[in-house]
Amino acid sequence: MSDLSDIRREYTKGGLRRKDLPDNPMALFETWMTQAKEANLSDPTAMCVATVDENGQPFQRIVLLKRFDDTGFVFFTNLESRKAKQIAINKQISLLFPWHPLERQVAVLGEAEPLSMMEVAKYFISRPKDSQIAAWVSKQSSKITARQALEGKFNEMKAKFAQGEVPIPKFWGGFLVRPKSIEFWQGGEHRLHDRFIYTKAASEWQIDRLAP
């Protein structure tokens, strides 16, 4: 067994104060996302998405956030993937944005709902053609014999769709995560981190400080 207990560091990049928080958590999220992009973080839109199966077994994976607004957070995926199948069983979902270099993280609890075909189509046609073709290739989360099988299927589909537009697969779509709570975490000195949680209450958000 490896002992990692001596790996530690101080958090020194600043605090988070109640008086500085906007009433709407999405406004703070937009500020933090902008700062993450300006800091040239690797994949600032990458989020850990957690879902659960029919037995309550959770599973997590990294997915890219594609849009956010006051209604929530949007991502796209293969509808035959493990995440989509689990969402169909249980729409409760958790998102985590781990912005380690900024000593920040944002944790979201909410419910996922399918996007309309219009919203899916709008995003799909904006993707590079190779990415559109790749959506046809992978039966996500299924077992395959070798990578060559994927590459062969990609080349086959690339030839098939060489001319004209790539149609949207029926098994490809997206989800809107409507947040019920959003927690903002900022690292602090001596492990006295700042944590604030926004909880949806009717049409407003309640803001509470949490112990680190």
UniProtKB/Swiss-Prot annotation:
Disulfide bonds: none annotated. It catalyses: pyridoxamine 5'-phosphate + O2 + H2O = pyridoxal 5'-phosphate + H2O2 + NH4(+); pyridoxine 5'-phosphate + O2 = pyridoxal 5'-phosphate + H2O2. FMN binds at residues 61-66, 76-77, 82-83, 105, 140-141, 185, 195. Its cofactor is FMN. One of its GO terms (biological process) is pyridoxine biosynthetic process. Binds 1 FMN per subunit. Pfam families: PNP_phzG_C, PNPOx_N. Keywords: Flavoprotein, FMN, Oxidoreductase, Pyridoxine biosynthesis. One of its GO terms (molecular function) is FMN binding. NCBIfam families: pdxH (TIGR00558), PRK05679.1 (NF004231). HAMAP family: PdxH. PANTHER family: PYRIDOXINE-5'-PHOSPHATE OXIDASE, PYRIDOXINE-5-PHOSPHATE OXIDASE. Belongs to the pyridoxamine 5'-phosphate oxidase family. This is Pyridoxine/pyridoxamine 5'-phosphate oxidase. It comes from Shewanella denitrificans (strain OS217 / ATCC BAA-1090 / DSM 15013).
